[in-house]
């Protein structure tokens, strides 16, 4: 009887010590840098999306890390479907897209197609003549809202695929 008790105690101790080792054996941190594909080592923002891709905004482009490889997105003046600027300030996720604030506008990246759309948030839809500060957020209803220094608040209208200004008294002060 006593031997059975000892065997049970030893069995419980073995399970208690082996289980944590097994469960943590696959959690390996990997260092990524410009040596293995990151566009720049100076990171401005990081987001893990719903599919567990890590999006890294740097001073020299946007990077997507899926656990195996890094895909980069950079500005190209000859490609209107490229990101609007290489300085990535903020990344948020909403309704299957990533919204990216750069020093030269807001961009939407469709994660499924990897198509990028630029939004300059001006009435003439041209590139701003100077860098602006863009801050992105989501409303309680899931709308994308953008605050632009010197211009005020804008809300994204999905049906028109554009940002519309929000009239507020304090935005112009």
Feature-to-residue mapping (PLM):
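Carboxylate-rich, polar loop motifs that coordinate divalent cations or form catalytic acidic clusters
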Residues: 1-173
């Amino acid at each position: 009887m006593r031997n059975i008790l000892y065997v049970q105690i030893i069995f419980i101790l073995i399970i208690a010590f082996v289980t944590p080792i097994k469960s943590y054996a696959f959690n390996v941190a990997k260092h990524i840098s410009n040596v293995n594909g990151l566009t720049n080592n100076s990171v401005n923002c990081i987001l893990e999306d719903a599919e567990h891709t890590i999006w890294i905004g740097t001073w020299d482009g946007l990077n997507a890390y899926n656990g195996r490889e890094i895909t980069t997105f950079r500005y190209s003046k000859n490609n209107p479907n490229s990101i609007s600027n290489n300085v990535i300030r903020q990344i948020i996720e909403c309704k299957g897209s990533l919204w990216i604030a750069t020093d030269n506008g807001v961009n939407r990246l469709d994660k499924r197609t990897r198509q990028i759309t630029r939004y300059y948030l001006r009435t003439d839809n041209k590139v701003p003549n100077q860098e602006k500060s863009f801050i992105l957020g989501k409303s309680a209803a899931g709308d994308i809202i953008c605050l632009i220094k010197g211009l005020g608040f804008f809300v994204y209208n999905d049906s028109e695929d554009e940002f519309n200004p929000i009239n507020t008294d304090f935005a112009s002060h």
